[in-house]
């Protein structure tokens, strides 16, 4: 596992963004871990989060023209990623995000920031049902742009209602790749190397056996 992935897991644990234990998800599943990126909520944490996204984007070698953050969680992510790319890698990419409802006065429209054109890299925290991606695709197509790829913080690597995960469905439906800073397998590997978190290993493996893709 790359060092930045290990460091990101440590960072998420230190901010209680990532927790191991027993958690009931909206789906009703009992999960041995919980991830809430909304708890990256200070200037320092958001700056660091952007750096991890930027590192993962560079590692993925995605070719893109514009960063797009779907409302609402994707907005601060796209912003901090754009800053991190400029500061860390001297890559100055335009950044765009959407409103949930189109504005009829002022600058108007549904988009804020750069023009949504060319190859779009969508950034978000996680993909649960893929709803934000599908809504974003309507905007991307409306602007004659194309989806170059998606970068999220965590790929849960678990089935939805069918045999595929929401991420696999997005990849199938839009012929794009979904990348992540870390995935479920990385969490398992991290626990395998950590005596402190060893008690959670069995539950994590059981969860993967039951719901993994």
Swiss-Prot record:
A single cellular component GO annotation: cytoplasm
What this protein needs as a cofactor is: Mg(2+)
Pathway in which this enzyme or protein is active: Pyrimidine metabolism; UMP biosynthesis via de novo pathway; UMP from orotate: step 1/2
Q: What is its EC number?
A: 2.4.2.10
Q: Which InterPro entries match?
A: OPRT (IPR023031), Or_phspho_trans_dom (IPR004467), PRibTrfase_dom (IPR000836), PRTase-like (IPR029057)
Which enzyme type, at the first EC level? transferase
UniProt record, GO biological process: 'de novo' pyrimidine nucleobase biosynthetic process; 'de novo' UMP biosynthetic process; pyrimidine ribonucleoside biosynthetic process
Q: Does the keyword Kinase apply?
A: no
The source's domain of life comes to Bacteria
MF term (GO), any: magnesium ion binding
Q: Which UniProt keywords apply?
A: Glycosyltransferase, Magnesium, Pyrimidine biosynthesis, Transferase
Query: What reaction does this enzyme carry out catalytically?
Result: orotidine 5'-phosphate + diphosphate = orotate + 5-phospho-alpha-D-ribose 1-diphosphate
Alphabetical list of Pfam families matching this protein: Pribosyltran (PF00156)
Q: Does the keyword DNA-binding apply?
A: no
List ligand-binding residues for orotate: 34-35, 128, 156
Residues annotated for 5-phospho-alpha-D-ribose 1-diphosphate binding in this entry: 26, 72-73, 99-100, 103, 105, 124-132
What does this gene product do?
Catalyzes the transfer of a ribosyl phosphate group from 5-phosphoribose 1-diphosphate to orotate, leading to the formation of orotidine monophosphate (OMP).
Describe its partners and assembly state: Homodimer.
Question: To which protein family does this belong?
Answer: Belongs to the purine/pyrimidine phosphoribosyltransferase family. PyrE subfamily.
Q: Spell out the protein name for this chain.
A: Orotate phosphoribosyltransferase
This protein's species is: Haemophilus ducreyi (strain 35000HP / ATCC 700724)
